[in-house]
A protein has these predicted regions:
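Flexible, glycine/charged-enriched surface loops at secondary-structure junctions
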Residues: 90-94, 238-243, 290
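A general boundary/transition motif marking the beginning of the first structured unit of a protein
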Residues: 104, 216, 241-245, 253, ...
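Scaffold signal of the M16-like zinc-metallopeptidase fold and its non-catalytic homologs
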Residues: 45-50, 230-260
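Active-site phosphate/pyrophosphate-binding segments
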Residues: 228, 246-291
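N-terminal export/assembly segments and adjacent metallocofactor-ligating motifs
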Residues: 1-235, 264, 272
C-alpha cells in the first residue's frame, strides 16, 4: 500500500483471511503498523470491490452508470482496439500511462505497466508521484545530477532534525520508508538530540517527547531556508573542503543568500530574527543534523 511495507500477520480460517495484526516479532517494524494496513481486510472483503472488468452499458451523460461484467479477454481486446485507434488517429503521445501508488509496489504490475507505455510508443508517463512529489526528483536531479539517487535522512544517527511541513503522526512520512515514525522522533530526543517542526499550525506530531513547532506563514519555507543558510555562512559553518569535493557553484549560492538575512525574512515568514539565528545555530552545532 505504501513504501514502508509494514509487516502484517494474517489469521486464516477455512482458507479465508479473518484478521490482520502487526508482526510484533519483525526486527525492523517491531510490531508497528498503521490503521491503513490493519484495516485493509475491509477493502479485501468489501462487497463493492471490483473483481472483474466492467463495461458501461449506458451513456456517460446518464446517471447512475450501469455496468455489465465481461471477461478479461474481452476487456483486453476492446481496450487494445480503442488504444490503437487513438494512436493511429492522433499519434503515440495521445496515450499516457498513469501508475497508481500500489502499482509501484507490485513486482508484477510495475514492469507490465512500464511495458504498456513502451509498446504504445508514448513518452507520457505519470504516477501518483507526479502530483504528490514531483518537486523531489526535480531537486535531486538539480543537486546530484541524476534521478536514480533518492537520499533519505539517516534518522538513526541524527542529533538534530529540522522538519519542514512534515506531519509524521498523520502521514507516516511517505518517501522516508520509516516504521514507527513517532518512536524515531522520540529516539532522537532520547539520545539528547532535538526535533524542530516548521509548520503553519501546531501539528499532532509535536509533543514533549518528540519535538517543538516553530510556526511559519504558508508558502514561505524557502525564505527561511535561505536565511538559515545565510546564518550558517556568516558564522563560518560551511565546510568548504567538503563542498569543494562534492559540490560546485558555492559562490552562486552565497550571492543568492546574501540578500536574505534573518531580519529581511522576518515579515514574510512570521518568524523573528533571533529564532532564525537559533535554528541556524542548533543545526550548525549538532554532531549530525538532518532536514
Amino acid at each position: 500500500i505504501c513504501e514502508p511495507l509494514c509487516p502484517l500477520v494474517a489469521s486464516v480460517e477455512d482458507g479465508r483471511i479473518v484478521k490482520l495484526e502487526p508482526d510484533r516479532e519483525h526486527p525492523v517494524s517491531r510490531g508497528f503498523a498503521c490503521h491503513k494496513g490493519l484495516n485493509y481486510l475491509q477493502v479485501h472483503t468489501d462487497p463493492d470491490r471490483v473483481n472483474t472488468p466492467l463495461r458501461r452499458t449506458n451513456p456517460r451523460s446518464e446517471m447512475p452508470g450501469k455496468f455489465q461484467a465481461v471477461s478479461w479477454d474481452a476487456a483486453f481486446a476492446d481496450i487494445g482496439q480503442r488504444l490503437r485507434a487513438i494512436r493511429d488517429a492522433h499519434g503515440p503521445d495521445a496515450i499516457s500511462v498513469y501508475f497508481g501508488n500500489p502499482v509501484s509496489l507490485n513486482s508484477n504490475a510495475f514492469p507490465l505497466a512500464a511495458s504498456l507505455g513502451a509498446r504504445s510508443g508514448s513518452k507520457r508517463n505519470f504516477s501518483a508521484g507526479t502530483q504528490d512529489t514531483s518537486n523531489k526528483p526535480a531537486a535531486i536531479e538539480a543537486v546530484f545530477g541524476t534521478l536514480n539517487l533518492f537520499p533519505i535522512s539517516e534518522f538513526a544517527n541524527a542529533h538534530y532534525l529540522l522538519c519542514f511541513g512534515g506531519k509524521p503522526k498523520i502521514s507516516h512520512w511517505t518517501y522516508t520508508s520509516l516504521h514507527r515514525p513517532l518512536s524515531v522522533l522520540q529516539d532522537i530526543a532520547g539520545r539528547g538530540g532535538k526535533v524542530r517542526f516548521i509548520n503553519p499550525r501546531r501539528i499532532e506530531s509535536a509533543n514533549g517527547t518528540t519535538g517543538e513547532v516553530t510556526l511559519i506563514k504558508p508558502d514561505s519555507d524557502v525564505y527561511l531556508m535561505a536565511a538559515i543558510l545565510h546564518e550558517l555562512d556568516r558564522t563560518g559553518r560551511f565546510d568548504e573542503a567538503r563542498i569543494a569535493r562534492h559540490g560546485s557553484n558555492l559562490d552562486g549560492l552565497r550571492a543568492f543568500i546574501a540578500r536574505y538575512s534573518p531580519e529581511v525574512v522576518t515579515d514574510v515568514t512570521g518568524i523573528d530574527a533571533e529564532t532564525i539565528r537559533t535554528i541556524a545555530r542548533e543545526y550548525g552545532e549538532a554532531p549530525a543534523a538532518a532536514v
